[in-house]
Amino acid sequence: MRTVDLIEKKRDGGELSTEEISYLINGYVSGEIPDYQIAALAMAIYYQGMSIREIHDLTTDMVASGEQYDLSEIPGVKVDKHSTGGVGDKVTIILMPLVASFGVPVAKMSGRGLGHTGGTIDKLESIKGYQVERSKEEFIQQVKDIGISLIGQSEHLVKADKLLYALRDVTATVDSIPLIASSVMSKKIAAGADKILLDVTVGQGAFMKNMSDAEKLSETMVALGHEVNRETIAVITDMSQPLGKAIGNRLEITEAIEIMQGRGREDITDFICEMAEILLDLAQVEASQEEIRQHLVGGKALAKFEELIQAQGGDLTDLYRHTSAPVVTDIHAHETGYIKELPAMAFGKFAMQLGAGRATKSDSLNYETGIVFEKKVGDSVTQGDLIAKVYSQEILSEKMLTEFEKNVIIGRVCKKPNEILKIIS
């Protein structure tokens, strides 16, 4: 078997056999197949796609390339959740303690941010002392003890994905549905949960720009989950504007706490309750929307979040402090009407310029900077109203102020977007 022949086969639209896929993945992980050949293969897959059988085989081999977690010693139905990425996405930080407050065991590994999208682990690391690294034994024991653990991705999990992702990032093959699906699901399967909820974001602030691609990715990942007896549900959600009101690590922790204190925006509060209902249903726990909301805003989710923070070394006093960013700039409405657009991609990139995100994996973060929106799409504004506050390390330049203001689109018609667009199971 020659690698070049398999690249040619896929380039010409052929279907790779189970044995051929194993040969390629095992050879790449062992170092026998060089980067440049796998780069060529990734581009062939990008253009020619893969059958569901090929994607299943690719995912299976990726899972086998690293350590796998066995969570069977934790009683109950273990649930996991994954988002394909977005701007201002602090859902995991609120949703997982909320679900755990119902007695559902949550064993969750999360990632860091890259580019305009934020990462859950970065947000948690803005809390003084919070330890994102845990051994497998510590991770499992904590779930047994308090019902929840939220850590960073294990270095030993899905080695093939780490190699492939780094390669895709520099070869313009990131947004390939077969490669995204196998990357996401290999990590979820290896992490060991029984049931999986996928938040597939769509819109100009997401990797999936249109509904057709989001549906195809969702259907592929749900099918992969079912192939390995992991019930999987995908929820396609809107990422045309930032989620919630805050973008930035510390600012999003503050918003998460406000939501768990019953002081959050209604739209994101409702969205989290709907997502919780789906996760609880997966875990075979019956709960009404009223019960879920009471857990969220009545203190039970927050108590579980505090328990999580303490268990992982976090400082509860630091948890409740506000951002220490030295410069705060108010942005006001330049006309009267309704907020028509707040493009997520543009504001995600703006937050990156403030230091709240990374352009490359080696970039350091400023945990304190970011944006807090006082108005969102569909909200009415009068000229001069406060639309947002920008938290920065230095005074904003005129260029940055102009850039921010031009992306706040005000119209004459009130149109509020739906957060959940479609559910695929």
Residue ranges of predicted features:
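Acidic, glycine/proline-rich low-complexity segments that act as flexible tails and inter-domain linkers
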Residues: 1-88, 127, 261, 307-311, ...
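Alpha-helix C-terminal capping segments
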Residues: 47-48, 93-105, 187-192, 227-228, ...
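Glycine/serine-rich anion-binding loops at beta->alpha junctions
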Residues: 77-100, 104-116
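Short beta-strand segments
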Residues: 109, 143, 151-153, 199-203, ...
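A glycine-rich helix N-cap at a beta->alpha junction
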Residues: 123-149, 219-225, 229
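Phosphate/diphosphate-binding glycine-rich loops and adjacent basic-rich segments that engage nucleotide
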Residues: 144-195
